[in-house]
């Protein structure tokens, strides 16, 4: 047996081999040592000839949980089953690996999140620098293909897909493989076969492009090799181009917190969390897919909006749909289990219950006053023949196991009915025997029982043994308090009963497998139905949210006009409540392309910028938007740089991250894009940062023309409004009352007059002595406002070069010669721009004036020390404004 194990293990060196021995899966040698550690189970050993062989095992019936633990940690598990009956085997029972479970091929269990896809991806690079990406969710049968023009585009798409496992060729470079593992947190596997098979025509027969066919073939070969069975539920591959959707890189999605928050990386607090009023798992998955890829096709956007508007105003119909959808199980994954051959009777009951909801869904949708409703009704296929089959055949409450009987209804199969009658008649005879023997012996406690070891028996308690007539029974077993007996007649009836039950169970299993095979014929229809239900669920979710929060239908402008009246940040509004949220307007057109936003910290600049972007995203996925009125252009891309999440592990500082993200936006943005830049340049010295910020603003203004919201603390930059005709100043309002700053969270035209930095520090609860010292320093600095600023360090040219920030052709960003370039390229505006920094109303103040010695500060209290320690631990660069405000309240409470 060990030789058999070693032979099979050699074929799967990178996987844990779960080797079936009776009712256990056993692991041996290094697999056992490592599995015992990872699963925290007992490591033992068995005789292996010259030495003891390390061994551990898990029960067959509970193996799924252990397998999921290993898969979750990135391992693979090969399932090796006994493929012949041990009773008839000659020598060692024949065993084979029947499935290789990998991080990307999980089909069931807790490892599958209900409202998330579980993707396996195959990435194929080509000599011309393009990449073919094929990915599939084995649990649902979805397959998608796309061709990407560069590694940067491929990297962004891989992030959007979120694959658990990535398949590449075996000759892929080690450095690239390591980057895939580290960058995406995915397992990496290998497959070299990209040849095509006729059996895949149903999946990729319609794909004409050779590169996509190769990428798909790599994926499909890996699936066939690991799953070792037909995959009839794989759907025809969906081909798409990333240019047909709004583009957002992973940084932009994270900054906007579309599907997860910056701080916790969790779902709660994200836009997905807000929008998800879906009531089916299929709808939840589709919602995330829509959010990952907002549309740019106005006709399709309007189609969705028409549906949402109708459902929003049809309250009772919407509630009826929600009630019916709650009765729909995860049809996509049920179909996957049916195709896989591991669906049980309960799965088929869930499928039947889901189908029983479809007629009511069709009726409700068909009654909606909307032309598109008829098209959706056509896809809501009730599969009446399948419902009839399942209604006639499967018990309403079957057991979990498919090999213990009680699966099939009476009347479905005549032979099964005969077996059951024999078993039931036999059991009735047993009951009659018990009554007869009680009367004959006078022993009221006499009973006829059954166990698997002895079969049927007559049990008499010890006090009643004298009442048993001599020779009436044959003694079989002595217990502490009773004796068990048998009779020839009882054993004869037992044989008849057990034979009938055994044959009944065997026949039930055969009938169930045949029924499951019949269900497979409906897979394409069921998958079409599942997609229709998912779409209906997402649309009703949008309508429910839009109705609850008073969202409005967006209008779209072909003149690049953006008008948002009474706009709100949807997530912040939900958290704070509509009564506490301060709405704001935003107006942009061809003459007002850029908004330069100034104002103090915590006044709402970042929230304002985010809400504009989120309004655009929501509109382009077909949802109503949080505003009183919204007119929007259709954006092809959204770029953001909000906050700073330093990639220290990659040696990238805040400044480097700023420059990389600025470069990405500048290189790819068009006049139809939306750019959000929050305090660009703060990662380096003051003048360098200011110069960079001005240069970036000018470049976007002159060469790109994208709608841009640019927030800054460099008040000097507000003078750019005089030289850049399409730039306008706006500011976040704040006022002082009784020496305290009050943030109004209102955006108004014009530049801000103050930053209120010391007021913010005071709100944070910093020690009073520290605040007074800051005010003294500020007063001295203001006195020295006319003095020339000391050198504050040179710009990090190395970081700029590494970031590859270039504005035109190979022209490098050279702040020292910027004025000369402006004079040469734009003589009409050059003179105005050359003096922006010199003419700015707010000169930078020296941090090192000749100050008098500071007074001796009183010692800090224990509370103040604790608050300071807590303040030092805060990573402000990874906090949202709301989280920062909450932290300030905590510190303030600590100091009171």
Curated annotation (Swiss-Prot):
Belongs to the DNA mismatch repair MutS family. This is DNA mismatch repair protein MutS. ATP binds at residues 599-606. One of its GO terms (molecular function) is ATP binding. Keywords: ATP-binding, DNA damage, DNA repair, DNA-binding, Nucleotide-binding. It comes from Geobacillus kaustophilus (strain HTA426). CDD domains: ABC_MutS1. PANTHER family: DNA MISMATCH REPAIR PROTEIN MSH1, MITOCHONDRIAL, DNA MISMATCH REPAIR PROTEIN MUTS FAMILY MEMBER. The gene is mutS. Pfam families: MutS_I, MutS_II, MutS_III, MutS_IV, MutS_V.
């Amino acid at each position: 047996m060990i030789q058999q194990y070693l032979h099979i293990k050699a074929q799967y060196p990178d996987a844990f081999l779960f080797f079936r021995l009776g009712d256990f899966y056993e692991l041996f040698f290094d697999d056992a040592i490592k599995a015992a550690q990872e699963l925290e189970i007992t490591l033992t050993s068995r005789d292996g000839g010259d030495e003891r062989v390390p061994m551990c095992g898990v029960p067959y019936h509970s193996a799924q949980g252990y397998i999921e633990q290993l898969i979750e940690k990135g391992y693979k598990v090969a399932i090796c089953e006994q493929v012949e009956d041990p009773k008839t085997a000659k020598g060692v029972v024949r065993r084979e690996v029947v499935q290789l479970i990998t991080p990307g091929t999980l089909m069931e269990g807790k490892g599958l999140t209900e409202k998330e896809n579980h993707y396996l991806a195959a990435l194929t690079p080509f000599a011309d620098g393009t990449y073919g990406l094929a990915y599939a969710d084995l649990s649902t049968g979805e397959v998608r293909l796309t061709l990407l023009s560069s590694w940067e585009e491929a990297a962004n798409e891989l992030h959007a897909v979120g694959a658990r496992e990535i398949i590449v060729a075996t000759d892929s470079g080690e450095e690239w493989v390591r980057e895939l593992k580290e960058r995406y947190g995915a397992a990496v596997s290998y497959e070299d076969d990209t040849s095509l098979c006729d059996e895949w025509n149903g999946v990729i027969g319609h794909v004409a492009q050779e590169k996509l066919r190769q990428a798909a073939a790599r994926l499909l070969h890996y699936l066939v090799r690991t799953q070792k069975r037909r995959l009839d539920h794989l759907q025809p591959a969906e081909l798409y181009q990333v240019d047909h959707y709004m583009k957002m890189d992973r940084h932009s999605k994270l900054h906007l917190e579309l599907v997860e928050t910056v701080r916790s990386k969790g779902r709660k607090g994200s836009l997905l969390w807000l929008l998800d009023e879906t009531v089916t798992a299929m709808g939840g998955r589709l919602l995330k897919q829509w959010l990952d890829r907002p549309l740019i096709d106005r006709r399709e956007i309007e189609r969705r909006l028409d549906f949402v508007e109708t459902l929003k105003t049809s309250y009772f119909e919407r509630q009826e749909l929600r009630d019916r959808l709650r009765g729909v199980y995860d049809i996509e994954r049920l179909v996957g289990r049916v195709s896989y051959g591991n669906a049980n009777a309960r799965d088929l009951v869930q499928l039947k219950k889901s189908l029983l909801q479809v007629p009511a869904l069709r009726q409700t949708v068909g009654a909606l006053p909307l032309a598109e409703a008829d098209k959706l009704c056509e896809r809501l296929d009730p599969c009446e023949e399948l419902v009839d089959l399942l209604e006639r055949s499967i018990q309403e409450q079957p057991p979990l196991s498919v090999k213990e009987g009680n699966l099939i209804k009476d009347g479905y199969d005549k032979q099964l009915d005969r077996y059951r009658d024999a078993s039931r008649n036999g059991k009735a005879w047993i009951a009659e025997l018990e009554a007869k023997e009680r009367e004959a012996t006078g022993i009221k406690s006499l009973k006829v029982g059954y166990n698997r070891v002895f079969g049927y028996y007559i049990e008499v308690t010890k006090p009643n043994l004298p009442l048993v007539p001599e020779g009436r029974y044959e003694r079989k077993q002595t217990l502490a308090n009773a004796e068990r007996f048998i009779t020839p007649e009882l054993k004869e009836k037992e044989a008849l009963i057990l034979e009938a039950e055994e044959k009944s169970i065997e026949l039930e299993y055969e009938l169930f497998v045949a029924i499951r095979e019949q269900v497979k014929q409906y897979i394409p229809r069921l998958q079409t139905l599942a997609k229709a239900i998912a779409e209906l669920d997402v649309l009703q979710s949008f309508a429910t949210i839009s109705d609850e929060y008073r969202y409005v239908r967006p209008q779209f402008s072909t003149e690049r006009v953006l008008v948002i009246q009474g706009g709100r940040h949807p997530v912040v509004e939900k958290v704070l409540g509509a009564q506490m949220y301060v709405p704001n307007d935003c107006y942009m057109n061809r003459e007002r392309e850029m908004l330069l936003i100034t104002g103090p910290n915590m006044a709402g600049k970042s929230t304002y910028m985010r809400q504009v972007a989120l309004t655009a995203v929501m509109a382009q996925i077909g949802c109503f938007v949080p505003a009183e009125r919204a007119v929007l252009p259709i954006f092809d891309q959204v770029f953001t740089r909000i906050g700073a999440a330093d990639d220290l592990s990659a040696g990238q500082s805040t400044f480097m991250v700023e420059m990389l993200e600025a470069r990405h936006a500048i290189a790819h943005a068009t006049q139809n894009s939306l750019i959000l830049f929050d305090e660009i340049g703060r990662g380096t010295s003051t003048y360098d940062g200011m110069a960079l910020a001005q240069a970036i603003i000018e470049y976007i203004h002159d060469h790109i023309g994208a709608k841009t919201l640019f927030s800054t603390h460099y008040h000097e930059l507000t003078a750019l409004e005089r030289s850049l005709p399409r730039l306008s100043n706006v500011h976040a309002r704040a006022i002082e009352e009784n020496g305290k700053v009050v943030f109004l969270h209102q955006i108004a035209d014009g530049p801000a007059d103050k930053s209120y930095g010391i007021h913010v520090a005071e709100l944070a609860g910093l020690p009073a002595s520290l605040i007074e010292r800051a005010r003294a320093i500020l007063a001295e600095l203001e006195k020295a406002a006319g003095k020339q600023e000391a050198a504050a360090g040179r710009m990090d040219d190395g970081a700029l070069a590494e970031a590859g920030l270039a504005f035109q052709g190979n022209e490098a960003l050279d702040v020292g010669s910027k004025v000369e370039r402006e004079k040469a390229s734009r003589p009409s505006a050059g003179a105005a721009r050359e003096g922006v920094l010199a003419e700015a109303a707010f000169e930078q103040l020296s941090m090192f004036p000749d100050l008098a010695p500071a007074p001796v500060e009183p010692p800090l209290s224990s509370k103040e020390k604790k608050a300071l320690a807590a303040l030092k631990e805060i990573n402000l660069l990874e906090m949202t404004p709301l989280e920062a405000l909450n932290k300030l309240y905590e510190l303030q409470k600590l100091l009171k």
